[in-house]
Amino acid sequence: MALRIEDKKAIVAEVAEQVSSALSAAVADYRGLTVNQMTSLRKQARESGVYLRVVRNNLARLAIKGTEFECLADALKGPLVLALSKDEPGAAAKLFKNFQKDHNAFEVKNLAMSGELFGPEKLDDFAKLPTREEALATLLNIMQAPVTKFVRTLNEIPSQAVRVFAAVGDSK
């Protein structure tokens, strides 16, 4: 069924709004998937905070125009599903990677982040990106390490003095 111009404008506006707040994007070919498999993918996307939409390529091009994901414009060919990571930069890649394990017909085409276009070979790298909490925990550990080491060194001085006095006392 053909879309009316109002419907097309609404779709472009919705996708453009989601793109404006996205951290990363992934595009995949969904040919060969059943309706139940696509429904499962959509459910997993909702659970992981990923915006997922099957959108016509021309409408997607209009939605990403002027954004950091404009680099995807030339990659939009054929029937594609667009996934946008909203909270975590690697969420869409993780979703696609996990889904691709069980569904051979599902093929990731491109990934984009910070205005750069990446091929499907970078899917594993994107999927391994830490969550915000993991990144903050790592940063905190790095920042605490010198302080912790300094405190241990300060505590070692009185401990050594006590051991020296104990050794002197034992020798007499």
Swiss-Prot record:
GO terms for biological process: translation. Belongs to the universal ribosomal protein uL10 family. GO terms for molecular function: large ribosomal subunit rRNA binding. It comes from Francisella tularensis subsp. holarctica (strain LVS). This is Large ribosomal subunit protein uL10. Part of the ribosomal stalk of the 50S ribosomal subunit. The N-terminus interacts with L11 and the large rRNA to form the base of the stalk. The C-terminus forms an elongated spine to which L12 dimers bind in a sequential fashion forming a multimeric L10(L12)X complex. The lineage of its organism: Bacteria, Pseudomonadati, Pseudomonadota, Gammaproteobacteria, Thiotrichales. GO terms for cellular component: ribonucleoprotein complex; ribosome. It comes from the Bacteria. Forms part of the ribosomal stalk, playing a central role in the interaction of the ribosome with GTP-bound translation factors. Keywords: Ribonucleoprotein, Ribosomal protein, RNA-binding, rRNA-binding.
